[in-house]
Amino acid sequence: MAANQHLVLELFKSGEFKQRLIFLLAALFVFRIGAHIPVPGVDAAALNDFYQNSTNGILNMLNMFSGGSLERFSIFAIGIMPYISASIVVQLASEIIPTLKALKKEGEAGRKIITKYTRLCTVFLATLQGVAAAAFVYQQNVVVIGQIEFYFSTIICLVTGTMFLMWLGEQITERGIGNGISLIIMAGIASGIPFGVSQFLNVATNNLALALIVVISVLFLVYIVVYFESAQRKIPVHYARNSNSQGFLGKSNHLPFKLNMAGVIPPIFASSIILFPVTIIGWFRGGNNVGWVQKLLLWLQHGNSVYISFFAVSIIFFCYFYTALVFSPKEMAENLKKSGAFVPGVRPGIQTSLYLENVVMRITLWGAVYITVICLIPELFSSILGAGLSLGGTSLLILVVVAMDFSTQVSSYRVSQQYEQLMKKYNRDIVS
């Protein structure tokens, strides 16, 4: 505890860290303020009554990711999910369309163009979800203004809100601490914890044994997440250097590969894939769902076996997909060869590339299984108990992983500060 306090005091001596922390807190405060600014023309009391009586799992998940903005129908009601969906679409397209694939290889200039396409796709998807949200809310008889006026103002407010959150996330990443989009999602989820705690206390008073099981399960899942997120596969690497007297002398090192290289991206992407089409169908059909639409919405409710199966398959797919995006074994093998490094027992070049690819595929399988289990255990609890849990596996994973990433970022600032102090002392000694 004393060590943590000393770390905080040390960091606050750094002007840059203070500025970044203040910017982060201010940005998250703006996000929470925006989550309480309602879209004009809606009877807030009537809308609140509707959500209190709703058992729609899709709506509850959307509400979780938006930080409670959906139940208040605020300007951030559709949240950051259109941006996440757009990122999926553009990243998939960049693996299929030759023009986009070429842009990925053009460095910073290509990245800026791809970012522009992602933003345009975000506007398109946010508009679709804005229209769907307006249609859904209008069907609930909670609107107090004209239909055309309501649709126009709602779409403008929701699309603007999503684009603002996208911009805010980018600013946090650039000028704050950690990944902005992840921190916004985390802040939204964390805002629902007080309500979840109150629900849990109600359960605890009625069923102490169940409450104890839930507490033990949550603590165990947190431990598992921390353990697996810290797990690494270390591949030994030798660096050869020339020596006139003894030929080649080796210097040993290792390449650390995280068990979960994809982080929280797979469950977020999987949730987005499930939420977007079902939300569009359900919101446009309102309360008149019949036939296959009604059956589809029923299948994709939380706790349903079809939903659990589809969610699991989607998580595993995105684990492999995102890992393939962020890691190139061929490029790493080439870099090792150029630096005179080699993996013991493996020939440099293509053999090293195949070896690294094989290692990453194996650890990605274990990482995918781990994420899937963490995300699905609460879903299975919901199915068995016949009651929804306020803190799902995806929420728990995001909270713990983003918190760990934030802690890592803070530690890196500490190391950077110590290095700067060391360099200043060294320069003073040189001058004197």
What are these model-derived regions, one by one?
Residues 1-104, 109-432:
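N-terminal cationic and glycine-rich segments that engage phosphates or anionic surfaces
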